[in-house]
Structure formats: C-alpha cells, structure tokens
Amino acid sequence: MNKSSFFIAGQHAVIEALRNPDRKVLRVFLTEDAKKNIHRKNPRKNVLEDVKVYFKSKKELDKYTSKEQLMHGGYVAEVEHLDQPDLKEYIKEKKNCTFVRLDEVTDPRNIGSLIRSAASFQIDGLIIKERHFPKDSKLMYKSASGCMEHLNIFQVSNINSTLKNLRERNFWVYGFDARGDKDFTEVKWEGKNVLLFGSEGFGMREHTGKYADFFVKIDMSKDIESLNISNSAAIVFHHLSYLKKKSWLFNK
C-alpha cells in the first residue's frame, strides 16, 4: 500500500527521521553546511546513504517553509507516515502504562511541544482523534524537535468509546482541570492511567469529562489563570517520571 508523503523541516526533525529505521525518507534537501553537520552528528553511520539528497541554498529551501513562516535551518525532507500502532495490541501485555489524551487541542505547536515532553519523560503514548491531528504539519514536527520518532501516537476515530474501553480494562482516567478536587501530586500514580487534557481556551468538553474517574489540578499562584497546555503537561510528565525512577530505586 502506498503511503502519502509530506514535508518536514528543521535540523532535529530531519535528522531523527533519518535515524529512524521505521521511517521512509524519500528525499532530503540540504545546504552544504547542513550535510556536514549531519555527518558530524552521525560519525558511525551514513544516514544519507540510501536517500536521494539534493543540495540547495537557504533561499531555495525557503519555498518549502515560507507559508508557515518556519525556520528550516538548512534541512527539509520528504517523508512517509509511520505505520500506526494498534492501541488494543499495545495494552495487551502491559501492567503499568500511561497515555495522554488531548481533547480539542489542535494547535500544532502545542501538540509538538507536548509530544517532545512526553517522549522525554517516557510516556507510553498519545491518544488523539484522527481528524483533530495535524499529521502533516511542519510546525508540529519542528516543535517536537525529532520526538515524533520516539512516541507512540494512537489515532482513534471515537475518543469517548476509546476511553470507555480503557476504563473497562482497568485504566484510571484523570481529567486535568483548574477546578479539580486535589493537586495531581497527591495521587499515587500506579498501574494504568490516562491523563486527559483539555484545550487552553475552552478546557475539557463536558461529554468527554464524564469519562474521567477523577479531576485533578496543578497547584499554582492564584494570580495566574492558567498555563500553556504543553507547559502543564511537561510538569505532570516530569513528576510521573520522578515517581517511576524513585520506585525503581526503592525496589532495586
């Protein structure tokens, strides 16, 4: 089956795509300096060996990113989408795992930044509605800084039925809301969990929130109304990563 191709831009996005054996890279457009940098960063393997490489000036590369007003840094690539992981298969053998679910979060920069944080702190995956996911967005790939290659992204057609099915499989669903019952650090965070985040402007929709078992919040200054969604998520991911590491050291 032929997969649709699209363009990505930026040093980290392009280099990590080249390093990923599961990512088909069709063509790479580079400045001479960018090519040298790729070889410096990959001294043991020529990641450009099986790829069509075209050398361009920065001005020539601008045409690929001018619409998004994106800085390419001398790196542009045409790639195919990765195979989609299957959520049901993934959770079959898992005793402990954490997923993130975004509700009405559509800004590609925010999604990309959140993906970067999730991959950095070893979250198991992102669950997102197919039609709300900007899967071809250069902005998202640039904001993710190469982490699109390191996080499972589960695209589903019906979020509510997915949450219902996960709850039936012993997942706890935590909705993050400024009016939550308690601070998220008071939760033990054991077993299987789904972290449910709403959009910055509108929060979580009521009919999605009804699938949450608990509502929790991030305690912060009363003078500040809210945090950016990607910042909020990064705080939570770091805390969960810390607890996981602490538990591992304790049981070592």
What is the predicted role of each segment?
Residues 1-89, 249-252:
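N-terminal positively charged helical leader segments and presequences
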Residues 8, 53-57, 151-160, 216:
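Short acidic-hydrophobic, aromatic-tinged amphipathic segments that line or gate anion-handling sites
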Residues 33, 58-60, 131-133, 179, ...:
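Short, ordered loop/turn segments at secondary-structure junctions
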Residues 120, 141-145, 209-252:
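Structured adenosyl-cofactor binding patch, chiefly the S-adenosyl-L-methionine
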